[in-house]
Amino acid sequence: MKIAVMGDPDTALGFKLAGAHEVYSFGSSPLEIERANNKLKELVERDDIGIILITETLAQRVEVPEVEFPIILQIPDKSGSRFGEAQLREIVRRAIGVELKR
């Protein structure tokens, strides 16, 4: 299974330098967001993709499908994380079936 990465040019470059092979970079224009939507749909339909990493900023602008497979994870970009603690707890609960408490 492959990991695909979708995000802004800086995030994409970082993952390329780290050795990721399926890395897709998108700007913020409406045309770029349309490209990102199309690429995400394509990646979800591929059998060889197991995980899709998408920056939180891009995920807010595209239609992220709710699918069990491949796993779609939102990651912070250079501006930091937009998730609060409660949202992160909910993601973990859905992923592993256990609620984390302090």
Curated annotation (Swiss-Prot):
HAMAP family: ATP_synth_F_arch
Descriptive protein name: A-type ATP synthase subunit F
Protein keywords: ATP synthesis, Cell membrane, Hydrogen ion transport, Ion transport, Membrane, Transport
InterPro entries assigned: ATPase_V1-cplx_f_g_su (IPR008218), ATPase_V1-cplx_fsu_bac/arc (IPR022944), ATPase_V1_fsu_sf (IPR036906)
Location in the cell: Cell membrane
PANTHER family recorded: V-TYPE PROTON ATPASE SUBUNIT F (PTHR13861:SF2), VACUOLAR ATP SYNTHASE SUBUNIT F (PTHR13861)
Keyword Transport: yes
One Gene Ontology MF term: proton-transporting ATPase activity, rotational mechanism
Family: Belongs to the V-ATPase F subunit family.
Function noted in UniProt: Component of the A-type ATP synthase that produces ATP from ADP in the presence of a proton gradient across the membrane.
Subunit note: Has multiple subunits with at least A(3), B(3), C, D, E, F, H, I and proteolipid K(x).
Keyword field contains Transport: yes
Biological process per Gene Ontology, one example term: proton motive force-driven plasma membrane ATP synthesis
Organism this protein belongs to: Thermococcus gammatolerans (strain DSM 15229 / JCM 11827 / EJ3)
Main location: membrane
Bilayer topology term: Peripheral membrane protein
A Gene Ontology cellular-component term: plasma membrane
A Pfam family hit: ATP-synt_F
